Amino acid sequence: SLFEDNAEFGLGLRLAADLHTATARKRLEELRDELGDETVDAILDAPQQYESELSQQRARVDALKSRLDSMTGAKVEDLRSVADHLLRRSVWIVGGDGWAYDIGSAGVDHVLASGRNVNILVLDTEVYSNTGGQASKSTPLGAVAKFAAGGKVTTKKDMALQATAYGNVYVARVAMGADPQQTLKAFREAEAYDGPSLILAYSHCIAHGIDMRKGLDQQYAAVASG
């Protein structure tokens, strides 16, 4: 999203998902006598950090729903309606650098400070791409862009450094064209991290004046040049 409410909406989705999960866990606990300790504890205590663990939890929830189909009662219906929320929900907030570094920076900071399990992906073109490629807070020192024909005279805002100040935020910088394996590793680590994460992804753009068919090559060159 370009707009300044992107982070707030994403955090709202996280809060809603957490509320649904808390409700589902409560409904499951209410049926402990009918379902048995083994079934209830297996679901409530299951780790859900990695894909393999999520697959196992998905199988448990499917088995639970099958059992609920053979049961009746108001509590059964209540649990059936929220059973899918026993699976961990992944929330990603995706936006550009104009949003994250500038118009929506306060919202991004609020999300990171919340400590909630929310992932933020910033597609960083280092210019205001949506309005024609003007120099921005994300533009590096010396880079030539609109409104900076002689080279930008100030440095790029270090958003990664700001995020690390909280001490509990997963932070990564990636460029798929420079190192696809590191990019994949960062996404997996951010997804598995139980807390806020921030990935700053260098992104090529038509505003760079390049042949877009060679965008990944340009990413490699940008990283290699420092």
Q: Model-derived features: where do they sit?
A:
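Patatin-like phospholipase A catalytic core
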Residues: S1-K75, G104, D211, G215-G226
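Glycine-rich loops and low-complexity Gly/Arg-rich segments
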Residues: N117-I120, V144-A148, P196-L198, V223-S225
